[in-house]
Structure formats: C-alpha cells, structure tokens
C-alpha cells in the first residue's frame, strides 16, 4: 500500500511551502533564532492571521477555512520546515478545546482573536510538587463572596511563554476534598491581573522561553471557567493529547534533513569528489529521509481521525521528539567531520544546528515526559496492565 497526499493536499503543501519560504525578512529570521515570544514573533503571527492561514483546518463556523485536520497538519509541518514559529499551544490545543467545551461567549470572544493572531495563551499545569503526577496540583481557586468570581492562589513552573501571553489556561483545584482527579477546574486567567506575576527560567540555549508563575488573589470571573466546575481533568488530558501531536510535526526533521542535504550538495569531499558520495554522509541523510517519512505517516494517521487517540498522540510525540534529537546530533557530526567552520555557509549551518539541538531538548519532556508516554502507549494502545504506583 502506498499512502500519499491527495492532489489537493499536495497543492496546498506546495502553496504553503512557497508562502512560508518568503514570509520572513532576513532581519526577522535572525531575531526569531533566539526570541520566539517577542514583538517580532507576534507581528509574524498577525501577518499569518491576516493571510487567513491560521485556521486552514478549523471549521468555517469558527472562522476557519474548513479544510480539515489533515490540511491543518500540513500547515503546521510546512511552518516547522521553514523554521517559522507558530502559536502552537493557542492554535492547536486551546482553540480546539474551546470549540468543544467553551461557552458561546468564550467562543465568540477568543476564537476570532486566535485566528487573527491577536491573542496568545500559555498552559499553566506543572507545579513544583506536581510534575509527572499532574493531578496532585495544589493551586487553589475559591469562589469569592457573591459567587461570581474565583480567587486563585498558587504557583506553576515551566510555563512556556507566560511572560508574553495574554491569558493562562490554568488547571486549579476547586474541590480539595474530592479525589485528586475529580476536583480540578480549568480557568482562563488574564495576565494583566495585578495578582499574576512571573520570574524567568533561562534554558540552556540562553533564551527566555520558560517561567515560574505566581497567583496571589488573582480574580477570575466564573464566566472564564471552561466546562463544569470540578470536571477539568478531561479537558487537561484532551489538551495534552493535542499538545503531544503539536510537538511532533515532521517538518522539524524535514528542516534538518533539507538544510544539511543542501549544504552537502555544495561541498567537495576528499579528492574533490562530491561530499554526497561519502558513505557516512549518505547513511546519515538516508536515515534522516526515512525518519522524515515515518514521522509524516504518524502525523497523517492522527490527522485522519475525528478524535485524537491517546496512544497515537503519544506515539507521534515519542517518535518525533527522539528522532529529532538523534538526527540533529547525527547531522551535526556529519558537518563537524566534513565542514570547515571558517567557511561562512558552514559556520552559519553549525550555529543553526547548535541552536536547534538546544531548543529541541524540551521535546522529550514537554507535554509529558517520554517515559510516561511509553506507559500510555503500553496501557491505552497495547492493553497492557497499568504500572503500579
């Protein structure tokens, strides 16, 4: 069996490839190498929104083009291939969750602004004492006198993009007496509230992506609760499944493969022979090409279904995260063996590969560490018994 895109999907891919290839100025691209949350990023997202691309797969009733999840995945892959950052959490996880569980007022307010690139969310889940065991979270939300507003107190950690977000999609405990999976609610927190604050966590790429966030009597209207009170765990798991798929676009591997392939094609190897004739270069690029196509199939498998399967989401995340890291190292070694860093083209490629390697470290634990993903694959996908705790 040969599986491929339809003619219409292939045409969309080619159109998006051309669009993303010409989207950024050289100055914008240089800024976005390290600053993927700031003003340049937000302007780029607004530009994509004005072009009508952000909602390519969203239903028309919510302002999208209505083409479907496969087309939305093509959009995400092509952005990753061109190394153009997207508001993945906002567009790929919060947006679909609001479509499924939001009130009419929430949909009317947030969804058009998301598609315009005007509103950005961060996810407030992990806490210092609740990482892998997320259901142990302690951040509290208590109804204030009168019952129309929650007062939120607590802290979160590793909140990516919180310093630049307009809202936090916050998991908090609204019933401390309930079993730990039962007393959780999802609130949308406005980051302009005076009780909200953050401190930066600088990651090893030297950039500021991640934060610790603090909530001190933060006021959240009850109208900003998503879904019923104490029924937030299902929203958490649904959002995480979407996030795991978001973390695994084949475009990341495509970017690594095509960039090094293009470099190798322009280089001479020993004795003046083409560098692409070297066996180690062929092996590395062949492996990258094969992994790229496997990743594409996993993306398409998830996109072809109406709902995101737990095991399929975890498989996609584990495979893509680990292959992206492994292939990044493999291709770096090829460039290190055969390239001259003093050469301008080679030096730029070395810098880009180093930044990718550091940036992609998060992939194996963002959205849930891969060790836990393997447990989910075993239990939800293969029907094996749960690991005793």
Task: Locate each region found by the language model.
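A short core secondary-structure module
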Residues: 148-199
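Amphipathic, small/basic residue-rich leader segments at the start of a protein or domain
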Residues: 1-88, 109, 113, 261, ...
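Internal helix-loop-helix
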Residues: 49-108, 112-117, 161-167, 292, ...
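Glycine-rich phosphate/cofactor-binding loops in nucleotide/flavin-utilizing enzymes
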Residues: 2, 74-75, 93, 233-242, ...
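A structural signal for short hydrophobic beta-strand segments in well-ordered beta-sheet cores
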Residues: 139-143
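C-terminal helix-coil-helix/basic helical segment that borders enzyme active sites and/or dimer interfaces
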Residues: 28-35, 269-276, 293-348
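Glycine-rich beta->alpha junctions and the first turn(s) of the following alpha-helix
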Residues: 2-7, 196-295, 363
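A short, Trp-centered hydrophobic/proline-enriched beta-strand micro-motif
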Residues: 117-126
């Amino acid at each position: 069996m040969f599986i491929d895109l339809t003619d219409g999907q292939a045409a969309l891919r080619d159109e998006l490839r051309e669009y993303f290839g010409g989207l950024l100025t050289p100055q914008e691209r240089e800024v976005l190498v390290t600053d993927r949350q700031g003003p340049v990023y937000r302007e780029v997202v607004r530009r994509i929104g004005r072009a009508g691309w952000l909602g390519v797969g969203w239903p028309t009733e919510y302002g999208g083009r209505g083409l479907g999840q496969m087309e939305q995945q093509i959009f995400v892959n092509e952005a990753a291939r061109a190394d153009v950052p997207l508001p993945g959490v906002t567009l790929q996880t919060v947006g679909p969750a609001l479509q499924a569980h939001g009130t009419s007022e929430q949909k009317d307010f947030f969804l058009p602004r998301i598609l315009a690139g005007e509103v950005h969310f961060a996810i407030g889940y992990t806490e210092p004492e609740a990482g892998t065991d997320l259901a142990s979270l302690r951040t509290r939300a208590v109804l204030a006198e009168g019952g129309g507003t929650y007062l939120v107190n607590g802290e979160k950690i590793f909140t990516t993009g919180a310093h630049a977000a307009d809202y936090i999609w916050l998991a908090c405990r609204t019933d401390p007496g309930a079993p730990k999976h039962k007393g959780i609610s999802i609130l949308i927190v406005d980051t302009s509230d005076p009780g909200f604050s953050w401190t930066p966590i600088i990651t090893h790429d030297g950039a500021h992506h991640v934060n610790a966030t603090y909530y001190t009597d933060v006021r959240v209207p009850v109208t900003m609760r998503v879904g019923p009170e104490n029924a937030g765990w299902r929203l958490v798991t649904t959002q995480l499944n979407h996030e795991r798929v978001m973390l695994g676009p084949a475009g990341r591997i495509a970017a690594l493969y095509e960039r090094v392939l293009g470099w190798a094609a322009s280089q001479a190897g020993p004795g003046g022979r083409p560098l692409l004739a070297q066996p180690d270069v062929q092996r590395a690029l062949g492996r990258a090409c094969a992994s790229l196509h496997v990743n594409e199939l996993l993306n398409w498998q998830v996109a072809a279904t109406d709902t995101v399967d737990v095991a399929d989401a975890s498989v996609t995340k584990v495979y893509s995260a680990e292959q992206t890291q492994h292939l990044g190292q493999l291709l770096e070694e090829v460039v290190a063996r055969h390239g001259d860093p003093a050469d301008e083209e080679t030096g730029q490629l070395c810098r880009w590969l180093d930044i990718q390697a550091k940036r992609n470290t998060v992939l194996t634990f963002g959205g849930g560490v891969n060790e836990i993903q393997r447990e989910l694959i075993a239990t939800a996908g293969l029907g094996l018994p749960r690991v005793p705790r």
